[in-house]
Regions:
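Residue-level signature of catalytic and energy-coupling elements of molecular machines
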Residues: 10, 72, 110
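Short, basic/glycine-rich phosphate-binding loops at helix/coil junctions
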Residues: 66-79, 135-140
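Short, acidic loop-to-helix structural element flanking the phosphoryl-transfer center
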Residues: 77-114
Length: 140
């Protein structure tokens, strides 16, 4: 048995699931306003002055800090069940299935948040290593 490791966003998907989730959660208008509000962090990232991790943490904080964890989980699962399939590359699924048919262990490693990736991975019998969002007192 071999280990087959895949990145999720941009490898298995045609587009970024994080951006898609923000739009699904808040709507396109709030997404655009949020991008404008976090533009300084995005510019710092594009100039390699802050890490991807740092930039993503700032964006997550902007869009989700203080949100109900129950609402977040619920919408993440709905996003996974209703939207993720639309952005999956056919050739990526073919390659994943090839590995599974050869009894290889398939693992997705992603910086994206587990709450929308895990339902899709579970449905497709794929192991997942991803970002877990911090929850305190049922708040993001």
């Amino acid at each position: 048995m071999k280990l087959a490791i895949f990145d999720f966003d941009g490898t298995i998907t045609k587009s970024d699931s994080f951006r898609g989730f923000i739009i699904f959660y808040h709507g396109y208008r709030r997404f655009i306003l949020g991008v404008l509000a976090t533009l300084p962090s995005l510019v710092l990232y594009w100039l390699n002055l802050i890490s991807n991790n740092n930039m993503k943490q700032r964006v997550i904080t902007h869009f989700f800090k203080g949100e109900s964890a129950n609402k977040f989980r619920d919408l993440a699962e709905k996003y996974s069940n209703n939207k993720i399939g639309n952005i999956i590359r056919d050739e990526a699924i073919d390659k994943i299935n090839w590995h599974k048919n050869n009894r290889d262990e398939v693992v997705i490693v992603s910086a994206s948040i587990d709450m929308w990736l895990k339902p899709w991975c579970d449905k497709n019998s794929i192991k997942l290593i991803s970002t877990e969002i911090e929850i305190k007192e049922n708040k993001i």
